[in-house]
């Protein structure tokens, strides 16, 4: 009812808790959320995700009110790439096209030529000239993976996701031995040794699609465990096993920041229309260009 009264739309990332995903009007990965935000006719966007996702929505929809239930929901990748340090890195490599992963702050996007997500990074890199000099940040593991499948030699920033870097290769091998018919699904933010074990490497949306279409009954999933909710909903007859982290005493395959988005906070955010995302207009004017470039290229490529 609150949504109807306020003409609000609730968007949720696949990494949020299942109860949040079930309440959302739209659930997706970073690319799908950006595409949806750019086209929504709602007056208020409630972004159930981390801070940079709210910023991206606000940059794309400056006239709309964009809310995030907890402003402390940041991102280890975005935090690993401070805008001033990244700008200095860019200046140290003149003549390079700058590609930033969507998991960055608005200020970092502002010194970027084109933004990518894990759904379109390979295709966008391949759309550039073969001899193009490229800087890629902040996720070094994703950058290494893109280099390996495209033959490019992008200069990489040294950032990492606190969830994806903690998966245990040895424990995944043990799981695979115990479940020999299981397919291993891995996000490209994982370390290279995990990706070598995978039957498929892809974005959350790509892994979900593979799980739905593949005939296997069991899957070992090496990405944030929130995606298992959507996988299980789509395929109740299949078994999805979260890939274990090195440290078995923690829920390390959960994003600490995504888990800050709770049902109570979502209700309060809708009721009080707070906390609101704001982006400095000067930064937004620069950051919108690489985001639009990503959306334009993705549309041309049918992504």
Predicted regions and their residues:
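Active-site loop-to-helix "anion-binding N-cap" substructures in soluble metabolic enzymes
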Residues: 1-202, 206-221, 228, 232-243, ...
